[in-house]
Amino acid sequence: MAENLIIGTGNKEEKYRELLPQLHALVSTETDLIANLANVAAALKQTFGFFWVGFYLVKEDELVLGPFQGPIACTRIRLGKGVCGTAWKEGRTLIVPDVEQFPGHIACSSDSKSEIVVPILQQGEVVGVLDIDSNELDSFDTIDARYLEEICTYIG
């Protein structure tokens, strides 16, 4: 998969099933975290056309923006703040069907309508999060959660 993804035109789950082995092969041969995060963000954006795909990395007491695909984003997020900070604090995946209904949502873009945030764990500790935003309401479900959690195990 060095330069090209091979993804069919099936449903969401079929696309994840085709993407996962390609991503695993890509990140398992590269030791640089930033390179891997950048390629994962690009692959997810290319495959699914999400509005925004990116990573935040834990640096001391806040999440700091890492590689991403999409419009300019919030640079720093405190523990427990917004969807990303809450997923970090709780150590679990959060699916938000309507970001306007999430208490304390941080609006990096008014075009973001729904969101999923998946923690990246290393030895049981959250070291970052994968954040994906859609410009449509209710874009994410347990299928996304299951496959994105698996992708995050490749990174952690």
Report the location of each language-model feature:
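Regulatory sensory and allosteric helical modules in signal-transduction proteins
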Residues: 58-108
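Short loop/turn motifs at secondary-structure junctions and domain boundaries
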Residues: 47, 107-112
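Sensory-domain boundary capping and coupling elements
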Residues: 121-134
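Juxtadomain coupling helices with adjacent low-complexity linkers
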Residues: 2, 20, 24, 134-156
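Intrinsically disordered, low-complexity terminal regulatory regions
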Residues: 1-67
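Short hydrophobic/aromatic beta-strand element in the GNAT-like acyltransferase core
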Residues: 52, 117, 129
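A short, aliphatic-rich beta-strand micro-motif
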Residues: 114-121
